[in-house]
Amino acid sequence: MEEDLFSLAAGKQPSQQATNETAPRAGEARENAGTDHPGNAEDPAHRRIDYLRSELRRHNRLYYEQAEPEISDAEYDALFLELEKLEKAHPELSDPDSPTRRVGGAPLQGFNQIRHAVPMLSIDDIFEQRDAPVPDEELAEFYHKLSRALQTENVPVSVEPKIDGVALSIMYRNGKLAYAATRGDGDVGDDVTANVRTIRSVPLTLPPGAPPVLEVRGEVFMPNEAFAKLNEERDADGLPAFANPRNATAGTLKQLDPRQVAARPLAFLAHGLGAYEGPELRDAKDFWNMLRHCGIPCNEPVYYTDSLESTRQAVRDIDRLRHTLPYGTDGAVIKISSTATREALGATARAPRWAAAYKFPPEQKETTLLNIVVQVGRTGVLTPVAELQPVLLSGSTVARATLHNQDEIDRKDVRIGDTVLVEKAGEIIPAVLKVNLSKRPQDARPYSILEATKGLCPACGNPIMKEEGKVAWRCTNFTCPAQAVTGITHFCSRSALDVESIGSSVAEALRSSGLASSALDLFSLMPDQLANLNLGTPEEPRRYGEKNARKALDALQNARGLPLERWLIAFGIPLVGEVVAKALADTHPDLKHVADSPYLRDIVRLDELVEQAAKTNPNTRENKKAVKEGALSAEAVQERHQELMEEIDRLTAPYLATGYLRKNTAKFSYGSEIGVAAAKSLRSFFASAAGNHTMDVLHRLGINPQSQSYRASLLEIPAGSLSGKTFVITGTLSHPRDYFEQLIASHGGKATGAISKSTSCLLAGNGGGSKRDKALKLGVPVISEEDFYKMIGN
């Protein structure tokens, strides 16, 4: 990088086009995770580099696209730094798609995409290493690099707090907010204009004299006090707290319903500039003055320095001040002040050369883990939370830390009574890093969620379950009070009962007002109750209104007559999605028959019999050894195995005859989409207290959803024109995505979310670049909407 800086300072600037051409497109890094590199794949450094790239890509996807990070910033930074050092030491393993060359994640499919007028780059990090022998070593190295490039000892820079939020670009044209977009992959981001318009600190119009084109870069965040209040409310409602304000902000900003965004206290602060047409801005001071004139909220305080020592002092001042700021910050951003010098130094494909983010080391302290409590989230997931001896950490007293799940508890071997090291790196609920085993009490026992809860949900007392291959325990109760908001929202969703005017904000108001503690309570609502529902606050009330109330009640009345599969989806039973619900409707005339289904019973029983028969097979090594040693009788083993095989034959005969069960050597496969796991989940639900309560309530309401596709003969479903074909849908089409998914299913095909070699076709509208690129790379045909209609004979 030094050579680039010297050549740039001498006037050799790369064109903007060249910079853009080196920047990877959305999704490329993940798709190229297995790209071959020169060098020996058995070399330890090569293997470690491949591993780090793969892990960083995965964490980028979790952070930027799903807003569900698994690791802290400090852990991510450690992986990133290790990869950078290895790549510098092994230039022969260079890869233009490495995470060290990328900005962030791909745009979400739920939003339209916007191409940034000027690439929205990230900023390179420099670190203060904990207990480093030379303080601020990387800061000094960065400053000296700028000095050498500019051939001057003193470089004027600005220093400001690094906001721990979500990057956002807001475009103003002729004084009006034109659009707002997330960073995305740096070139293309998600259009979140409707959501950003609900943020009160963002001006929708600028005063006279504002630049005709002004693209402001900044951070959306949730103020600390508002975030603490939000978590207090969730705690009072028995909901798990958000891990940190950034997670809450990212999840809120990516809601598809702006009303949900408006209900959350988001704020915005500007710190940078994208496209610009207006009076010349000579330096950072001009930039900040222009923003203030326009009424755009600015990141403060800003320090102006012109030496290494004064820059160090500014960083120390921000470190002291950061716990008093109204938002989370984990560092200080250092930028060259002069606009002309910034343009001369330019940028790499990933970040500007004229700026760096100085990261403070996360604070760590030991404390005692007093207890572990299990909370039930709004989706039914059980989360273990450590209750700690209160300790002062990063300017606030903390007394709890999330332990995430049972696997995390087992991996760290966390036990009640342990002395644990906790870290707060931008986390409101700190992370438990590790256990100090030297201080472990002798009577400390391994912790089990299943044992601690006795297998029952702490919120409702119904059974909990863990799906195969998943890490989370989950409450299966459709009417669990802890899941009220999510349950009602899902119940009313388009794929379920399609009660359009009841979303999550209305569901939250219904729950908090006591009008509905579960989805089935909706059928007992009176028009005046719903019309007078307050969607605002006590200080600023906002009525739901008669029009919305009538609309919702009409939709609920219409829902009574919706087909069986829609109701099965509405219940939110684990593993029962649209495909399984349709198969259940094909094989059962109504809901009562599903609740007491011989078919589901037989699927579960067959699985048990096959497992028992495998254990009693006289030809297994274990049984032969037991017979030889006299522990088992050969005749008894053979007799029991024969009994089981005969019962299997009796059970499967009618299903084999109709084609709903097929046998390949000793294995069975199902002619419908109802597999063993889904059958077990359904049986568990209808046998539970929650399932019985659901059926009782529906009986009182006179509701017994009917199938519109029931085949009494249990014959094989006729193959359609798309039978055996798998489709992926991308881009903007003439109808919503679920319209095409239903068309595909009705013609015997299947719609999935991810491209693979087994995908038959990619149905592509406008946009959808990354999936289109991957389809072409894998040789998957890309078809238009017109091509698709021809395939189904329309």
Swiss-Prot record:
Necessary cofactors: Mg(2+); Mn(2+)
SMART domains: BRCT, LIGANc
EC number(s) given by UniProt: 6.5.1.2
Biased composition (Basic and acidic residues): 27-47
Top EC class of this enzyme: ligase
Active site residues per record: K162
Residues the record lists as binding Zn(2+): C457, C460, C475, C480
Single Gene Ontology BP annotation: DNA repair
Keyword Metal-binding: yes
Pfam families in UniProt: BRCT, DNA_ligase_aden, DNA_ligase_OB, DNA_ligase_ZBD, Nlig-Ia
Catalytic reaction equation(s): NAD(+) + (deoxyribonucleotide)n-3'-hydroxyl + 5'-phospho-(deoxyribonucleotide)m = (deoxyribonucleotide)n+m + AMP + beta-nicotinamide D-nucleotide
Domain BRCT: start-end pairs: 717-794
Keywords: DNA damage, DNA repair, DNA replication, Ligase, Magnesium, Manganese, Metal-binding, NAD, Zinc
Composition bias type Polar residues, residue spans: 13-22
Family: Belongs to the NAD-dependent DNA ligase family. LigA subfamily.
Protein's UniProt name: DNA ligase
